[in-house]
Amino acid sequence: NAPQTILGRVYDSIGFDKVGDDILRHLVIARCCEPQSKLATSAYLKSYFDEDISHFQIYRYMDKLYNTRQELVQQISVEHTKKILGGKIEIMFYDVTTLYFEASPGPEADIRQAGFSKDGKSKEAQIVLGLLVSEDGYPLSYSIFNGSQYEGFTMIPVIDDFVRKFSLKDFVVVADAGLMSSKNIELLKSAQYKYVIGARIKNENVKIRDWV
């Protein structure tokens, strides 16, 4: 099977074979070839790769991946990214999105809560997803937050954790103006992080628009 062979080599060259879970390999390849629901992915793997993996197994593996493999997967991803970028991560872009569920918000302790939704689904249960990527868009880190969490409160903890974990120095943080509250700017400065605030040109004053 050509996709399995070609994408399998890419998967191994990145280093994900070190995770040691065949189901992860199958899910990654299926996601690249035909991104769809877990149920449809199960059928796709059976039809095209003759892999008998039920959607229940896929859901259980998602829990395993998050609970026991997340650190290893991140380590592999970051090392691969550093190799591509010449051994150093100099720019980090941070952004946030919301992912909603076709369900009512859960109990108070549940991470799935109603909140400001980027999909206009403010009454649905959702989670907040924070994503940190390098230049050229290589993923560095992701974090999941309670659906009612204000997105501005997510940025600094994610960056601090990543910097500590990978001993980063001399880098620039880039985020849009919605995340760059005065409090976050103050925290960036106190940590001596360089930063760039993204903004819409049309919202800037005439002097800045002319300069751009």
What are the language-model segments listed below?
Residues 1-113, 123-124, 130-143, 148:
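Dynamic "connector" segments at or just before major functional cores
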Residues 8, 129-130, 160, 185:
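Short glycine-/small-residue-rich flexible loop motifs, especially phosphate/cofactor-binding loops
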Residues 68, 114, 125, 131-135, ...:
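Catalytic cores of nucleotide-enabled group-transfer and carboxylate-activating enzymes in metabolic
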Residues 118-119:
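Glycine- and acidic-residue-enriched helix-capping/strand-helix junction motifs
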Residues 151-212:
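An internal, acidic/charged active-site-proximal segment
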